[in-house]
């Protein structure tokens, strides 16, 4: 009798544990971790809201492509400044290091020949073997890890990579420090040939700096009934800025120092990166998301962040206005100078006079006063890529809620803000301009945004 009572009590206890004290009520599925919005480093919070988009004043060019209308944009985060040379170098160096480590790992695998694998790491690696693919613990692996190892074979940085790269060992760039001839062979294949070197100084072959990434075409997927794999896009492109834009953009002009030093010299680290196409800017956004989420995964208890991306044209204009509706410029006033006669942005104020504002070319990304949202150089310095495709009629046919005319077939992309070589007209918050997606210029840069998840109340 006692055993029966004890068994019944055990059943009741097990039942109560399985029910999670729901008592049959609809309580919802709650996440284990509470979500809170974290402002990304180097960004400012834009509350979002409605504003009058377009040209409030008569357009002196008669373009008629930016009529006024009221639109609403969601809250988002935006880079405080344009992406700088220093920040873009972090992307370039990551791609460079990935390529070097991949080649070193293959060379280590080739050099090891028929040697028995050493998953436990009992034998101390030397030379090229220090850069071998990171070992997987096949003894203590989970059933899932074993299944993935036996059925998939992938090299890279994904969470399911079977042969991940070894990022722990330091790379040597000084040729005197190369550990062995296998290392020398790999590095030799990555540098320009000796007969192409200037004054015998060989540099890294920037043509090899290619970044591969995948993205999902939501726009096409929502409108066509194909298979999911049809909307997965594979992109491979070179990420190094086109430094020759300083020569190509200006005929019969001496700009050799900018061509040679602007991206390379530390004097320009805090200046906005230029020579980057729309396609390269999107690749940078993908890498920035990947880089942050890789860190989040390593910490395990942190959630993944929303993707970084280029701003839509509407988001860019809303941010540029800084909360001032009907303003002509980001600082609000109708003039490009202060009451003391000082220029408020970096642009070409007079025909032929590029340096009247104190700078011939670009200035540091943190220059002049920020606008009402705390954003620097939303007018002048460099024009900025947006995610939106250019269409002269987009203001007439676009939505009034987060408007964005996105057309993958249209290679013309909106650039905003004007630059150091532009007249004041292009600095106006309502002025529109465009450039081809695969074209880089010495006066076009970019900044990124990230979506704010949830509602940000005023």
Please name every model-derived segment.
Residues 36-66:
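Post-signal-peptide N-terminal segment of Sec-exported extracytoplasmic proteins
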Residues 76, 83, 92-101, 288-298, ...:
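Short capping motifs at secondary-structure boundaries
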């Amino acid at each position: 009798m006692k055993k029966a009572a004890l068994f019944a009590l055990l059943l009741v206890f097990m039942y109560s544990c399985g029910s999670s004290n729901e008592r049959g009520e609809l309580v919802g599925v709650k996440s284990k971790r509470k979500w809170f919005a974290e402002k990304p480093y180097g960004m400012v919070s834009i509350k979002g809201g409605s504003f009058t988009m377009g040209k409030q004043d008569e357009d002196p060019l008669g373009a008629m492509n930016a009529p006024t209308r009221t639109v609403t944009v969601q809250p988002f985060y935006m880079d405080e400044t344009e992406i700088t040379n220093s920040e873009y170098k972090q992307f370039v160096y990551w791609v460079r290091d990935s390529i070097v480590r991949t080649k070193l790992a293959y060379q280590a695998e080739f050099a090891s020949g028929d040697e028995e694998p050493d998953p436990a790491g009992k034998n101390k690696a030397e030379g090229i073997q220090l850069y071998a693919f990171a070992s997987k613990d096949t003894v203590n692996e989970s059933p899932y890890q074993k299944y993935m190892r036996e059925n998939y074979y992938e090299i890279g940085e994904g969470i399911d990579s079977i042969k991940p790269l070894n990022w722990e060992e330091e790379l040597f760039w000084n040729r005197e420090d190369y550990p062995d001839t296998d290392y020398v062979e790999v590095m030799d294949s990555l540098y320009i040939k000796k007969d192409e070197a200037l004054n015998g100084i060989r540099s890294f072959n920037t043509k090899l700096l290619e970044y591969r990434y995948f993205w999902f075409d939501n726009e096409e997927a929502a409108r066509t009934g194909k298979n999911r794999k049809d909307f997965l896009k594979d992109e491979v492109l070179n990420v190094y800025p086109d430094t020759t834009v300083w020569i190509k953009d200006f005929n019969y002009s001496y700009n050799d120092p900018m061509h040679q030093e602007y991206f390379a010299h530390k004097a320009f680290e805090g200046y906005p990166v230029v020579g980057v196409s729309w396609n390269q800017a999107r690749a940078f956004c993908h890498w920035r998301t990947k880089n942050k989420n890789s860190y989040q995964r390593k910490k395990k208890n942190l959630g993944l962040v929303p993707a970084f991306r280029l701003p839509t044209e509407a988001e860019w204009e809303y941010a540029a206005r800084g909360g001032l509706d009907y303003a002509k410029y980001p600082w609000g006033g109708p003039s490009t100078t202060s009451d003391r006669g000082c220029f408020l942005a970096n642009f070409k104020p007079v025909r032929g006079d590029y340096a009247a504002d104190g700078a011939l070319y670009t200035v540091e990304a943190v220059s002049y006063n920020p606008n009402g949202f705390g954003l620097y150089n939303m007018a002048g310095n460099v024009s900025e890529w947006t995610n939106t495709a250019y269409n002269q009629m987009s203001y007439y046919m676009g939505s009034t809620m987060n408007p964005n005319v996105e057309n993958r077939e249209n290679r013309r992309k909106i650039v905003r803000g004007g630059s150091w070589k532009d007249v004041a007209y292009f600095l106006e918050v309502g002025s529109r301009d465009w450039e081809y997606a695969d074209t880089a210029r010495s006066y076009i840069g970019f900044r990124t945004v990230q979506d704010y998840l949830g509602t940000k109340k005023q």
